[in-house]
From Swiss-Prot:
The chain crosses the membrane at residues 34-54, 78-99, 114-134, 179-199, 227-247, 289-309, 321-341, 348-368. This is Cytochrome b. SUPFAM superfamilies: a domain/subunit of cytochrome bc1 complex (Ubiquinol-cytochrome c reductase), Transmembrane di-heme cytochromes. Component of the ubiquinol-cytochrome c reductase complex (complex III or cytochrome b-c1 complex) that is part of the mitochondrial respiratory chain. The b-c1 complex mediates electron transfer from ubiquinol to cytochrome c. Contributes to the generation of a proton gradient across the mitochondrial membrane that is then used for ATP synthesis. It is a multi-pass membrane protein. The cytochrome bc1 complex contains 11 subunits: 3 respiratory subunits (MT-CYB, CYC1 and UQCRFS1), 2 core proteins (UQCRC1 and UQCRC2) and 6 low-molecular weight proteins (UQCRH/QCR6, UQCRB/QCR7, UQCRQ/QCR8, UQCR10/QCR9, UQCR11/QCR10 and a cleavage product of UQCRFS1). This cytochrome bc1 complex then forms a dimer. Its cofactor is heme b. Heme b b562 binds at residues 84, 183. Heme 1 (or BL or b562) is low-potential and absorbs at about 562 nm, and heme 2 (or BH or b566) is high-potential and absorbs at about 566 nm. It is found in: Mitochondrion inner membrane. GO terms for biological process: mitochondrial electron transport, ubiquinol to cytochrome c. Heme b b566 binds at residues 98, 197. Binds 2 heme b groups non-covalently.
């Protein structure tokens, strides 16, 4: 019998074992679609970003007008830019849902996969932040100033670190050029990390909605899940193109249509919607270093979730108390997101502080306590 190239060729073998003959749990739901959606988001962002970079000039005097030129004079430049800007929002929607799925179904017990995933989230956040600075509008400039300034809270080396990051004594041309370099580099780093993420995942195989081993019932990835993924792509591209074509600036800040001016501070400096929850946590502590630590902890706390799993069951499918806690956490994150977009005044200050406290309490205290309590109730 002639050798099957798909199974014998060194490169095709890799593709085959990851996308074609991969044994997959038969009962994984649509919540398992977000991994592939993140992959397609990354590809879309790299492609549109590359096309934008060909027309972009990383210079403070030209950056803003080069972006305007792309939108006005380049063939479909407006569409490429709108897809890139809104693609970032969809990237974050997908990653947050992906993390939520992992949290709900106990996928974090694949520790290496989970930890590389958290590193991927951090890399994505860094990429989105430096990318937001590039159009060099008012919010770009002041966002860069405020967020980079947070590093000055680090004792002893803080100020030196900030000036080193800026390439001077304020956010200026050197900052913009290095941010462009970083924004170009990081997505490829994300792609490499995603490969590692998948390698770790395929060591143990995918989890499933019941949180039980599925070795007895696996089906090949292709055609079943390849088709399901393509359906997912279509369902995601529909709202993305709708947003990019009909209301491309819905999620942006009007302040960014004004070129950066170091002499005029915008009335409300706030990041894009996907960072608002972390921004609210940062603002809820009236001390600079404390706020920075809370901001870092808001994401880094995800590294602790595998250690805080006290339940004898993996998923929350059959744990109503944990489910209640999970949805409380989701509602709490939405409250934080809303508070982050509001000015720093009463009642938003106290709401933000309570929501921040609740966020950490649920993750660090209540989840392990409720997990242990459920074990007791089930006589485990």
């Amino acid at each position: 019998m002639a050798p099957n190239l798909r199974k014998s060729h060194p490169l095709l073998k890799l593709v085959n074992n990851s996308l074609i003959d991969l044994p997959t749990p038969s009962n994984i739901s649509a919540w398992w679609n977000f991994g592939s959606l993140l992959g397609i988001c990354l590809l879309t962002q790299i492609l549109t970003g590359l096309l934008l970079a060909t027309h972009y000039t990383a210079d403070t005097t030209l950056a803003f007008s080069s972006v305007a030129h792309t939108c006005r004079n380049v063939q479909y430049g407006w569409l490429i830019r709108n897809l890139h800007a809104n693609g970032a929002s969809f990237f974050f929607i997908c990653i947050y849902l992906h993390i939520g799925r992992g949290f709900y179904y106990g996928s974090y017990l694949n520790k290496e996969t989970w930890n590389t995933g958290v590193i991927l989230l951090l890399a994505l956040m860094a990429t989105a932040f430096v990318g937001y600075v590039l159009p060099w509008g008012q919010m770009s400039f002041w966002g860069a100033t405020v967020i980079t300034n947070l590093f000055s809270a680090i004792p002893y080396i803080g100020q030196t670190l900030v000036e080193w990051a800026w390439g001077g004594f304020s956010v200026d041309n050197p900052t913009l050029t290095r941010f462009f370099a970083l924004h170009f580099l990081l997505p490829f780093m994300i792609a490499g990390l995603a490969f590692i993420h998948l390698t770790f995942l395929h060591e143990s195989g995918s989890n499933n909605p019941l949180g039980i081993p599925s070795n007895c019932d696996k089906i090949p990835f292709h055609p079943y899940f390849s088709l399901k993924d393509i359906l997912g792509f279509i369902i995601m591209f529909l709202p993305l193109t709708t947003l990019a074509l009909f209301s491309p600036n819905l999620l942006g800040d009007p302040e960014n249509f004004t070129p950066a001016n170091p002499l005029v501070t915008p009335p409300h400096i706030k990041p894009e919607w996907y960072f608002l929850f972390a921004y609210a946590i940062l603002r809820s502590i009236p001390n600079k270093l404390g706020g920075v630590l809370a901001l870092a902890a808001s994401v880094l706390v995800l590294f602790l979730t595998p250690l805080l799993h006290k339940s004898k069951q993996r998923a929350m499918t059959f744990r109503p108390l944990s489910q209640l806690l999970f949805w409380t956490l989701v509602a709490n994150l939405l409250i934080l997101t809303w508070v982050g977009s509001q000015p720093v005044e009463h009642p938003f200050i106290i709401i933000g502080q309570l929501a921040s406290l609740t966020y950490f309490t649920i993750l660090l205290l209540l989840f392990p306590i409720i997990g242990a309590l459920e074990n007791k109730m089930l006589n485990y």
